[in-house]
Amino acid sequence: MSPKMQALLLLLGLITLLVVHAEEELSENTESERGCIKLNQECVQNKTPCCNNRPCLCYMRFNICLCEKPLGEIFGR
């Protein structure tokens, strides 16, 4: 493979990586602007909702509530 082709492929790979990273940051900003709580973050039931309609599950043993994945999301449904 020619050096020009290798440089072009490297450049395309870097651009793709930057676009994916920028999309992740944008989705995080959108969630925080909506006022929802991210996955595995502390939550209070019936207050600020968890993002993506995830449940706020409380663990009395540890005296903490967290936004968790629903069972369907855990098992890939």
Swiss-Prot record:
Annotated signal sequence range: 1-22
GO cellular component: extracellular region
InterPro entries reported for this sequence: Spidertoxin (IPR004169)
Expressed in which tissues: Expressed by the venom gland.
Subcellular location: Secreted
Propeptide: 23-34
Cysteines engaged in disulfide bonds, as pairs: 36-51, 43-56, 50-67, 58-65
Keyword line: Disulfide bond, Knottin, Secreted, Signal, Toxin
Superkingdom of this protein's organism: Eukaryota
Keyword Membrane: no
GO MF assignments: ion channel inhibitor activity; toxin activity
Domain characteristics, as noted in the entry: The presence of a 'disulfide through disulfide knot' structurally defines this protein as a knottin.
Family: Belongs to the neurotoxin 02 (plectoxin) family.
Protein name per UniProt: U18-lycotoxin-Ls1a
Native organism taxonomy: Eukaryota, Metazoa, Ecdysozoa, Arthropoda, Chelicerata
